[in-house]
UniProtKB/Swiss-Prot annotation:
Gene Ontology terms: cellular component: plasma membrane
Identification of the protein by name: Uncharacterized lipoprotein SAOUHSC_00052
Primary residence: membrane
Entry superkingdom: Bacteria
Covalently attached lipid (N-palmitoyl cysteine), positions: C24
Length: 255
């Protein structure tokens, strides 16, 4: 009888441990989602100039007279198997104090040369934004690049995360030492955001991506750190296809 009681108690204890561990995982997943919620709930912002009237997370690191600066970055990276890695994207700095926006479009080609050491060759094309239109500030002779800039749209302009709460059973990571955190979800090709990316980019794989939400800083909010989203289609040693996006709010003196 004593053995039976010990066995029952052992099973109950094990069940409690599993339940508590699972509960902690679910709780942390909810915290990670919530930390991204304020930013992702803003998507889509079709007219980027609306950000002049939107305020991000402020803390005592901000000067009271500083309205802050939004930093937008969208990038598509494609490296077919054993070929060069090509990254194309754009960064904009939207100063809410002066209501002016400048940044650059970039093309970065990374090649494996000199005994496998990677060499990148990034070219930047300065731009500004006027009336929600991206305009090069210097002459560009390459017609292909001019067209890419003219047609460029940031993910924040067409992405939509109203169904974020429906993403379940994510792979959650949290390091309180840094602090850093992430949540990874397997998507399908029927996902709205995946369809939007395939509509705008020539993505050379039929594989459905994983969505990665990753950030650093206090989970409850901080002007220090970052929050990035990434759609990873392929991730191998010599083959990579992924799209990354970020919308950050920083002190104007930091950018």
């Amino acid at each position: 009888m004593k053995r039976l009681n010990k066995l029952v108690l052992g099973i109950i204890f094990l069940f409690l441990v599993i339940s508590i561990t699972a509960g902690c995982g679910i709780g942390k997943e909810a915290e990670v989602k919530k930390s991204f919620e304020k930013t992702l709930s803003m998507y889509p912002i079709k007219n980027l100039e609306d950000l002049y009237d939107k305020e991000g997370y402020r803390d005592d690191q901000f000067d009271k007279n500083d309205k802050g600066t939004w930093i937008i970055n969208s990038e598509m990276v494609i490296q077919p198997n054993n070929e060069d890695m090509v990254a194309k994207g754009m960064v904009l700095y939207m100063n809410r104090n002066t209501k002016t926006t400048n940044g650059y479009y970039y093309v970065d080609v990374t090649k494996d040369e000199d005994e496998g050491k990677p060499h990148d060759n990034e070219k930047r094309y300065p731009v500004k934004m006027v009336d929600n239109k991206i305009i090069p500030t210097k002459e560009i002779k390459d017609e292909k690049i001019k067209k890419e800039i003219e047609n460029f749209k940031f993910f924040v302009q067409y992405g939509d995360f109203k169904n974020l709460k429906n993403y379940k059973d994510g792979d959650i990571s949290y390091n309180p030492e840094v602090p850093s955190y992430s949540a990874k979800y397997q998507l399908t090709n029927d996902d709205y955001n995946v369809k939007q990316l395939r509509k705008r980019y020539d993505i050379p794989t039929s594989k459905a991506p994983k969505l990665l939400l990753k950030g650093s800083g206090n989970l409850k909010g901080s002007s220090v750190g970052y929050k990035d989203i990434e759609f990873t289609f392929v991730e191998k040693k010599e083959e990579n296809i992924y799209f990354s996006d970020s919308l950050d709010y920083k002190k104007s003196g930091d950018v």
